[in-house]
Design a protein with these regions (language model features):
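Short hydrophobic alpha-helices and adjacent helix-cap/hinge residues
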Residues: 3, 11, 24-312
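Bacterial N-terminal signal peptides
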Residues: 8-20
Length: 312
């Protein structure tokens, strides 16, 4: 596990943890709202609950807008002290229907794309720093020189530009293709093996769909190309590897953002924080299928090796 967190928390946070009145903690309630009933959304909750030091209620909207709106109406009548929202649907509902309630979100791709913003909103970014991600690719697949990226024309996430620049700074030749629709996505993915040594999948709801991933996976396996993904789910589905946020760290960071708010900082001016701790996950079956040899000593830098893709 790679830990980038080298500084202690500020004095304001320490003060909040040490001297917050017991009666305030007992009477305060934090709402955790999950977009759906998924393991990925459950994973940060226990650490968040233990860190925040307040009563916590967990709600799931099950991907159903009507269920979400009923929950918003209930919470509007008796607002929680703050919200930890997991997933874009939950974060969007809270930011639009409970705009006065402080919220930290996580597991959200490109919040600005969905209008998840406001004076009481911050979050934990879904992407680790790109130079950290690329360092792991260089370690495990050092022969890669040309890196392919496919993006939709509507993807304006600032992280994309940061990722491309980081790849160039790391010495990669970047072949980036912008596409406008599903047909163009699949055509670009099919052309990639002739142009690159590896494909870097970045968060993009137009590009990364089940059908498109199947196309990419088939082409990459046939050409013996590594696919660097951004989530453990994609590695389980057949990508070679990912460098993804550690869920315990996400829960801790979300709690710390709210504790800073409770200590007197304005949550709306807190930057969306990059993950401090990441997990490197490798798909052994894919590694063998593409003929990639990895020195066994380097596996010490891998947090989990999947023997075979899991059922999703």
């Amino acid at each position: 596990m790679i830990d980038l967190h080298r500084a202690v928390l500020g004095l304001g946070l320490a003060f909040a943890l040490a001297v917050a009145p017991a009666e305030a903690a007992a009477s305060s309630t934090i709402a955790i709202i999950k977009s759906d009933d998924l393991d990925a959304y459950d994973a940060p909750i226990d650490v968040f609950r233990g860190r925040i030091g307040r009563s916590v209620e967990v709600h799931t909207i099950g991907g159903d807008k009507a269920v979400g709106e009923r929950l918003m109406a209930k919470l509007a009548a008796d607002p929680p002290e703050a919200v930890f929202a997991l997933g874009a649907k939950a974060a969007w509902l809270v930011s639009h229907q409970l705009p006065q309630v402080p919220m930290v979100h996580a597991m959200v791709l490109d919040p600005s794309r969905y209008g998840i913003d406001g004076p009481a909103v911050t979050g934990i970014r879904m992407q680790p720093p790109p130079d950290l991600v690329l360092a792991q690719l260089q370690l495990l697949a050092p022969d890669v020189k040309r890196l392919g990226i496919v993006l939709s024309t509507t993807n304006n996430d600032p992280m994309i530009g940061e990722a491309i620049q980081a790849a160039r700074n790391a010495g990669y030749t970047v072949i980036a293709r912008r596409v406008g629709n599903e047909r163009d996505v699949r055509a670009a993915l099919r052309r990639m093996p002739a142009e690159v040594d590896a494909v870097w999948l970045l968060p993009d709801p137009v590009v990364v769909t089940p059908r498109n991933f199947q196309v990419l996976q088939a082409e990459a396996l046939a050409a013996h190309l590594p696919v660097l993904a951004y989530s453990e789910g994609l590695v389980q589905a057949g990508a070679l590897m990912c460098v993804a946020p550690d869920p315990d760290a996400v829960g801790r960071m979300a709690a710390d953002q709210l504790l800073r708010h409770f200590a007197g900082e304005n949550i709306g001016v807190l930057d969306r924080a990059a993950p401090e701790v990441v997990r490197v996950v490798l798909n052994r079956q894919t590694q063998e299928a593409i003929g990639l040899t990895i020195d066994p000593t380097l596996l010490a830098f891998v947090d989990e090796v999947l023997a075979r893709p899991r059922r999703r």
